[in-house]
């Protein structure tokens, strides 16, 4: 820094002394700041121990050590050699700007007054020196410019002097030539004789040459001026041309630059346009694809709309047709009520004629059983009672009557509680637990050891059902369906009319069979055998509260809700309702009495005390004559009135008798259950066989592993649709106990149409020896658990099991392509006789004689009513097994959309009665 100042301040104008004095002042200031031995600085340092040694931030950044102002004299001599005006100017500008930084630094360290004062003085000196140096720099710059201009003028003067010297040399040479020529001429003239004449002539001649030379000189000068002017003109033109060329070049460069910029801009615009075009193309392609999809969806929606229109129209037609069918069924209901009243009047007249001593009081609304069949049954029972020990039988009768009256008292209390709050019917397909009752078939020609082994197998499986249900225990949920069950029993009245002809034929056939028997029967028998001997191929099924279905036929004190099995129930009726036995030994038409002949083998029965709420049940084992067994094993396949032939995967199955729905001695057990819903009347009526067809296995989540899955015809289809509406129907189930029979059936969705199954078209094959006893569920006491359920053949028209009526089935036929399987009803056939009307309702059929039956079996297999086999299901909320018949011939009435769900089934125990 001092070098630049010395270089600038040393000038020939005499300003060096001033700058040296200023430099000394700045040195003094710097020395004060850099001297560490000053007392003021020591005082401040002692007062403030934490204050560090003073050092400017600017000095720290730019390595300022306070030595730039104190330079030695030997360095000042060579300062002007390495300094330039630009460096000096930038240095002074830095010093001027340094004052602002010092002020900022002063604000930071304002707690030291002495240092602040010294720094302010230093700043003022530095600013003054910087301003003086800046002024001197400006003056030096002006002087340097003047020096350059003078040097340029000096060069021009040197050029002019050289030019003048050149011209002077030329003129001297020309004068020398002229002088030489003149001297030669003078020498020539002096040699002539006339001297004076020659001298005058030479003088004149020289003057003439001088004039000529002067003229030539002038011409040369003029020519020189012209050439100079021309050269100047050419020079000016050249300059102008150069300027024009330079301007043209600059213009071209400018235009080229503008063109390049425009080209780059247009390139960018083109790239943007191309990107936009690509984006538009993508959007266009996406829009085109969306248009195609929307057109496709539009077509689908149009097709769906047309289908929905068709379905809506079909549903409207179905609704109208359902309304018409409803009115038609109401008319048929009124007609059935009229028939019922007529039949009741006839029954009343027959009772008044038959026996004045009979005191069984039936209700006018329900005349299901006649006095003839009941009296005949009691007659057979009493004949068997003659061979028993009188004292033991009376003791047992008293104990049984005591249990019955206790049961009546409990049932009356339960009924009073359940009338005001009727329970809702559990719907199959829901998750509620339900009790499934299946038939327990067995053949009569088995050996005694085989019977015992089967009983042991049944006893081993009894413990599973003991924890799930107490048999015979009354409850409000079971008694809530009493009115519905009583209305179902009214169908027995209609079925009874179709059984009269069959009883006469069966009487003759039974007598013929018993006449061929050779062996006698040893041992004691009980009244229970009166029913078991007539139904040798039947199976006993125990309902939780099957006796409660008889309430409508007895006085209040005789209404039994506990299950009373077989002839034991008739025994109680005999003791309580008919004390007068004057006409008990009279023969009754249509009733078979077993007391007049011996049976081929001992009949053993086991009964458990159901009235004491035990967990076990009743089991009967009856042997059949060998001749009848051989006939049955070689009989041809037939099709019953209500039972269709079924061909299982395990092998062919044979129906044992020509009319299994009407047999007494060799018939299949048929039990009736009804699933009631608030739907339109259904056209589905099914008969459940027990031994002629493969039985179903009932699975339970709470039972042992011996239970298998249910495999029922039309189950999968009914489960898929019936379960989907379970919740809705649970909330809409109602109960009515005061309406008429037809109205209640219509409310519950019950009708008596015959279900036609295409499977009956296949002929039946004989049953092999290994299948003497049909497969029964694992919980049946009469047979061991099945290794696997026998599969059923698929049904073609599965929708008939859940359709409410034919128009709804037609609606589903349009949707799923189902073929119709029923013909529309003929309204013109309403006014017929009683048998034709019953046949039209699908409840009973006219039974042919045995000879005609044997000839018409093939025709019945083709054109007869086709019924699918099924198991008997009883909901847990029901208090009775609706429709349990003595003759096991009433068809099963299935509710529409009834999707049964198997859970647990109580097992029937085996207890020997001492």
UniProtKB/Swiss-Prot annotation:
Which ranges carry the HAP1 N-terminal domain? 48-353
Annotated region (Interaction with HGS), positions in chain: 359-509
The alphabetical list of record keywords is: Coiled coil, Cytoplasm, Endosome, Glycoprotein, Mitochondrion, Phosphoprotein, Transport
Q: Which InterPro entries match?
A: HAP1_N, Intracell_Traff-Reg, TRAK1/2_C
One matching Pfam family: HAP1_N
Q: Please list the coiled coil stretches.
A: 134-354
Purpose of the protein:
May regulate endosome-to-lysosome trafficking of membrane cargo, including EGFR.
Q: Tell me its family.
A: Belongs to the milton family.
User: Which PANTHER family does this entry report, sorted A to Z?
Assistant: TRAFFICKING KINESIN-BINDING PROTEIN, TRAFFICKING KINESIN-BINDING PROTEIN 2
Record's protein name: Trafficking kinesin-binding protein 2
